[in-house]
């Protein structure tokens, strides 16, 4: 008499973790197999390009203040909500991140605002 899959699943469902571990070992011995996970090969070539496409969070870096430091400080204050002293310290300490872990659209907007103020900025 054949045992139905449902009967096997019901029996396994009722087992404790210790009993399941013993069952796995018995399968390994009986059939000469291993329960270790199989390593799957990644996509050939272009792996770095695929990883770059999947990036969802970006960092806007202020590289240098440029000629109009006051305008850059104002832009940094608008973007970050920092106080005057904190924004000035950030601009003086460039290169520094202005915004971190933001979506692409927000990063582009922040970079444009900084560049419009005269700063050099980049998105990482």
UniProtKB/Swiss-Prot annotation:
KW Ribosomal protein (keyword) present: yes
Example of a GO MF term: mRNA binding
Residues in coiled coil: none
CDD domains per UniProt: Ribosomal_L7_L12
SUPFAM superfamilies: ClpS-like (SSF54736), Ribosomal protein L7/12, oligomerisation (N-terminal) domain (SSF48300)
Record's keyword terms, sorted: Ribonucleoprotein, Ribosomal protein
A GO CC term attached to the entry: cytosolic large ribosomal subunit
Biological process, per Gene Ontology: translation
Pfam families according to UniProt: Ribosomal_L12, Ribosomal_L12_N
Subunit structure: Homodimer. Part of the ribosomal stalk of the 50S ribosomal subunit. Forms a multimeric L10(L12)X complex, where L10 forms an elongated spine to which 2 to 4 L12 dimers bind in a sequential fashion. Binds GTP-bound translation factors.
NCBIfam families in the cross-refs: L12
Function, as annotated: Forms part of the ribosomal stalk which helps the ribosome interact with GTP-bound translation factors. Is thus essential for accurate translation.
UniProt record similarity statement: Belongs to the bacterial ribosomal protein bL12 family.
Record HAMAP family: Ribosomal_bL12
The protein, known as: Large ribosomal subunit protein bL12
Upper classification of the organism: Bacteria, Pseudomonadati, Pseudomonadota, Betaproteobacteria, Burkholderiales
